[in-house]
């Protein structure tokens, strides 16, 4: 099962000609999950190999404009491109409290009626995620009625035992959110692929006298079969070790995690995506504004024993290497060196718009 991440926007604060506002897509077998949706994300999607109509889930890390102002426009474009008869499953949208009302207000004020259903699930933040004066209580707007295509979403509270939020638990994935510290409540997401049955052991099947055909499929799917001689063959008799799932972790803007839940959820991540807005010489400024530097990101990655660190959300002063004029590339390359020095020279990737990173199946 193929899995990859496409970066649509790797810049901080606002979109520019060289770096779009924050957005990336996790793609698995054709299904696309969008993480953040800064202004201009739909245009970036059009320039990529991805199809907006394949998006089934959207995750918003926090409610700063450069991470979600592109959402209403994207939803409208998906609607316009979908035609009048749509029977698709609802698009599931996850984000902090306030996101549901934002979408509702933009749809109401623009007299927009989406042709597809959607559901907004809101994460309730805690007081230790940002400065006290910035934490706002959820305010329910006085709605005359719900948009016709909006389903009833969940209000997701922090699990006090695990210090995380359970967002998705289906046949393939478990997705949990964890708290980050920023100027406003921000979240990170851990996407874990569930273990899959191991491959069939052809030699054992032959030795046990299992004939090729439907019995193979049943055993592969965890169902025992009875042979003509009355012998029962269990899946564990003929299956190799289960294939361990992959783990991708995506952090929103932050100057740190609130507790150790983030470390636990990101432990041994195959891919850890972390912001690095400013270089290490500006660490005090970064922390003041709730952001990270390469050293801070790499320290977290090292604590998690992440297998690969990707830095993103760069200040627009840091041009991509390929697009920087002579001498300008030094700044972005220095960020890479700063992170690698913490990770004992383990290679660190600098995200660029339209970069695609594959996450191979574990052997």
Curated annotation (Swiss-Prot):
It is an enzyme of class 3 (hydrolase). The active site is at residue 66. Zn(2+) 2 binds at residues 66-67, 253, 313. It is found in: Cytoplasm, Cytosol; Nucleus. One of its GO terms (biological process) is tRNA 3'-end processing. One of its GO terms (molecular function) is tRNA-specific ribonuclease activity. Zn(2+) 1 binds at residues 62, 64, 182, 253. This is Zinc phosphodiesterase ELAC protein 1. It comes from Bos taurus. The gene is ELAC1.
């Amino acid at each position: 099962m193929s899995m990859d991440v496409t970066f649509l926007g790797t810049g901080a604060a606002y979109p520019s000609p060289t770096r779009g506002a924050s957005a990336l897509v996790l793609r698995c077998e054709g299904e696309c999950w969008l993480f953040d949706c800064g202004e201009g994300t739909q245009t970036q999607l059009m320039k990529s190999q991805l199809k907006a109509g394949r998006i089934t889930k959207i995750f918003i890390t926090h409610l700063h404009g450069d991470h979600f102002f592109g959402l209403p426009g994207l939803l409208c474009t998906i609607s316009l491109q979908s035609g009048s008869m749509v029977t698709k499953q609802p698009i599931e949208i996850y984000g902090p409290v306030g996101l549901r009302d934002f979408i509702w207000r933009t749809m109401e004020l623009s007299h927009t009626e989406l042709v597809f259903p959607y559901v907004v699930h809101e994460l309730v933040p805690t007081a230790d995620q940002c400065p006290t004066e910035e934490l706002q209580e959820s305010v329910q707007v006085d709605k005359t009625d719900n948009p016709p295509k909006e389903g009833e979403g969940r209000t997701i509270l922090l699990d006090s035992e695990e210090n995380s939020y359970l967002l998705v638990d289906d046949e393939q994935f478990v997705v949990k959110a964890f708290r980050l510290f920023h100027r406003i409540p921000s979240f990170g997401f851990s996407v874990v692929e569930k273990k899959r049955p191991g491959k069939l052991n052809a030699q054992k099947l032959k030795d046990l006298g299992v004939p090729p055909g439907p019995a193979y499929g049943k055993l592969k799917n965890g169902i025992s079969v009875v042979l003509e001689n009355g012998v029962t063959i269990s899946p564990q008799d003929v299956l190799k070790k289960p294939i361990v799932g992959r783990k991708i972790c995506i952090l929103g803007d932050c100057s740190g995690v609130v507790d150790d839940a983030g470390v636990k959820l990101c432990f041994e991540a195959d891919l850890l995506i972390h912001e690095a807005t400013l270089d290490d010489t500006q660490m005090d400024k970064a922390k003041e504004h709730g952001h990270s530097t390469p050293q801070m990101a790499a320290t977290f990655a090292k604590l998690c024993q992440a297998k690969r660190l990707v830095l993103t959300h760069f200040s627009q002063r840091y041009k991509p290497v390929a697009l920087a004029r002579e001498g300008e590339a030094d700044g972005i390359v220095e960020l890479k060196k700063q992170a690698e020095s913490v990770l004992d020279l383990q290679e660190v990737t600098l995200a660029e718009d339209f970069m695609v990173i594959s996450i191979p199946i574990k052997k």
